[in-house]
Every structure is written in structure tokens, then in C-alpha cells.
Amino acid sequence: MSPLPLRDPSHQANAGPRLVEPSCGPGVSLSNRTLCHPSWPMYDNWGRSPTTSERPEEEQVVSKDTGVPVRNYEDVFLLDPLLPCGQRVPLILTKPPQQAMDSRKLLLPPPIMSPSVHPSSSQACSSTWLSEAEMIALAGLLQMSQGEQTPNCVASSLPSTSCPDPVSVSEDPGPSGDQSCSGTDT
């Protein structure tokens, strides 16, 4: 057996640019990001205007404005690369297939999740503010669940009605080690 030559002397380089037609053969794609769908050949054939010799007599002439010829619901599907080969994900259409297609573009059903906020009709959630005692209790529970300070520090760290001005709070700790208001006795 003789080794093959590295360069075929009869091969001539193509002088001009080559146009690549869209093809859906196995492993062929328009770019590295274009996936081929098994229904594309049907759409490509529909997009080309057939001559009278190629068209059977019993087939009706369909205008391009009527949509892509989808015969039944099984013709509209999606492929999932994680599923076994050949398994399809059916696309549930709300309209008959002939009405769901428009100018070679599949009209998908409306999304399940809406971008608009639906107002709540229940009155269970009120927008009233918590009282000071409720805030202290809630802050204490949160800090206890995180294993932080004692509840005495929680009460002094929150602004209270007896010490409304944060400037009047002294920086040196009181007898119990907590901060105290300058105008109050501890």
C-alpha cells in the first residue's frame, strides 16, 4: 500500500468566494450557534415556489400568506438535547395548526407567567407599621436566633421615646455595660 500524497497535484484552488446554501443535513449548520430542526426541510420546500411539473395535480396550491403547511398537532414540536434521540417535546397549540402559523413564523402561545403584577384581593396582608414594643420583640427574636447580644442591648440599640435624640446618647457604658441616655438614670 502506497502512502497518500500530502497535496493532490490535480486539485485547483477555488478562485472566488463560495456561497453556502442553508442545509439541514446531519451535522450541517449555518453557523456554530445554529441548530437544525427536523421540520426545516419542510419549511424550506414550502418557501420555494414549485413549478407545475414538480407539483402533483391533487395537491392544492396554497398561498404563502396562509402559513406553513402543518398537517396536525404532531408536526409542531421542540427537541430537547437531554432527551433520548428521536423523542419530541410537543408544543401545545391553543389554535388549530393552520391558524397558529403566520408568514413562516410560528406564533407561540402566550407565556405562562405574566410580566404584570396581579393585585391581591385578600386583606390578610396589611401595610400598618409595627409598634415600638413589637419592633423590640422582633429584633430580639432575630438576634437570639443568630446567637448575638442579649435582649437588654436590643432595647437600648433601638430608638425609644425616652431617648429620641441620638446625639444625647453617651459613648461611655453605664453601670450595667449598656449605653444609657444622658438625661436618664440607670
From Swiss-Prot:
Domain of life: Eukaryota
Composition skew (Polar residues), residue ranges: 148-163, 177-186
Region annotated Disordered, chain positions: 1-25, 148-186
Alphabetical list of InterPro entries matching this protein: SAP25
Record GO cellular component, one term: cytoplasm
Quaternary structure (record): May be a component of the mSIN3A corepressor complex. Interacts with SIN3A and HDAC2.
This protein's name: Histone deacetylase complex subunit SAP25
Source organism of the structure: Mus musculus (Mouse)
Lineage: Eukaryota, Metazoa, Chordata, Craniata, Vertebrata
Gene designation per UniProt: Sap25
